[in-house]
Structures are given as structure tokens and as C-alpha cells.
């Protein structure tokens, strides 16, 4: 069964978003379902710190032994940090997609930046 933490928000593109409760900053990663479908992740291309991203835009890609998949911005804002550990160990996405395998953090300007995201129950229904 797919792990879907209740405290996170989700996108239909199988990304999760965590409110870090500091300066309107959110941490972003891919879901357990996504990493399972991708198979062994071998390379991750992330956005650059300082990039301005728009929700729904392609901001990078994830390459696995099965395919190459686009990485989408779940919210609009500025990239504050990226997970540099993924350059040397992209398999963290498979091992710990909600912890060590996070992708990037983004600072949003709008208070309702996450209004379009799914809660855990809605994401589970999407998968069913």
C-alpha cells in the first residue's frame, strides 16, 4: 500500500508539498507512489536556487531505469534551496521520498498558493 502522510498536500502529478511554517516556505518532493512507478532513480535535474517558478511549469526532470519524467512546480514562487544530496545519491528518492529524498524548497508570495493542492484523502482517491 502506498504511504500518503496526512500532514502533506499533494498534486495530481504525484508531488508532495510540506508547509515549513517559516517565511511562506514549502518543501517539495515526489510521492511514494511516484517513486514506485518510476523504479530505480538514477539522475535528478533540479531548478536553480533563485529561479522563479510558476505552478504547473516544468522545472526539472527525474530519470529512472524505466523512463524520464518531468518535474513540475506545485506552487508559484522562488526556489530557496535544492537537495544537493540527490546529485550523488539520486536513489534517496526511492529510499525516503518524504524525508531525505526531498527535492527543493520554494518561497511563495500568495497566501493561497496551495489552495489548488489535494489533501491526503483526495490524493488517495486519485490513485484508486
UniProtKB/Swiss-Prot annotation:
Q: In Gene Ontology terms, what is a biological process of this protein?
A: glycine decarboxylation via glycine cleavage system
Cofactor binding note from Swiss-Prot or TrEMBL: Binds 1 lipoyl cofactor covalently.
Q: Which UniProt key words apply to this protein?
A: Lipoyl
Identify residues that carry N6-lipoyllysine: 66
- Lipoyl-binding domain: residues covered: 25-107
DNA damage among keywords = no
Superkingdom of origin = Bacteria
- Name the cofactor(s): (R)-lipoate
> Disulfide bonds, which pairs?
none
A cellular component term, taken from the record's GO annotations: glycine cleavage complex
Tell me any Pfam family this protein matches. Answer: GCV_H
So what family is this one in? Belongs to the GcvH family.
Q: How does it assemble?
A: The glycine cleavage system is composed of four proteins: P, T, L and H.
Instruction: Explain the purpose of this protein.
Output: The glycine cleavage system catalyzes the degradation of glycine. The H protein shuttles the methylamine group of glycine from the P protein to the T protein.
Its recorded name reads Glycine cleavage system H protein
For this protein's source organism, the top of the classification is: Bacteria, Bacillati, Actinomycetota, Actinomycetes, Micrococcales
Q: Which gene encodes it?
A: gcvH
